[in-house]
Amino acid sequence: MKSCEIGQQGESAAALFLYNKGMSILERNWRKGRFEIDLVCQDIKTLVFVEVRTRKAKGMLLPEQTLTISKRCNIIHSAQLYLMDKKDWSMPCRFDVICIISKKTTLELEHYKNVFEFYEIMDSSNTSWQPW
């Protein structure tokens, strides 16, 4: 199976997993320019931006080890663009990561909630990420 097919399989499994946990799936693979969010969900009154990391079982790195600082910054920036695009700043937000290991016939899935914050990409002045 090709890398992109494994990624798509992982994203589909993650969306189904979150749906079965009671979340609403609002967007899949939302894009703005070069920025992308794998899944945008709503968990009761919280907007959840989900990064899905899928790897083959025989890979050298675990999925969670591939989430670099640069990638986190891109995810946070993507979320800011999403909120600006939708013009809806009313809900609290969080960032989740779903790590999936693709084995021959099964997927092993781990869900990590609230793994990083908007302020991680801010400078030391802690300027608000909201537009006002």
UniProtKB/Swiss-Prot annotation:
Which Pfam families does the entry link to? UPF0102 (PF02021)
Per UniProt, what is one GO molecular function of this protein? nucleic acid binding
Q: Which InterPro entries match?
A: Restrct_endonuc-II-like, tRNA_endonuc-like_dom_sf, UPF0102_YraN-like
Q: Entry's PANTHER family?
A: UPF0102 PROTEIN YRAN
Q: Which family does it belong to?
A: Belongs to the UPF0102 family.
- Which HAMAP family does the entry mention? UPF0102
Protein name as it appears in the record: UPF0102 protein LI0223
Source organism per UniProt: Lawsonia intracellularis (strain PHE/MN1-00)
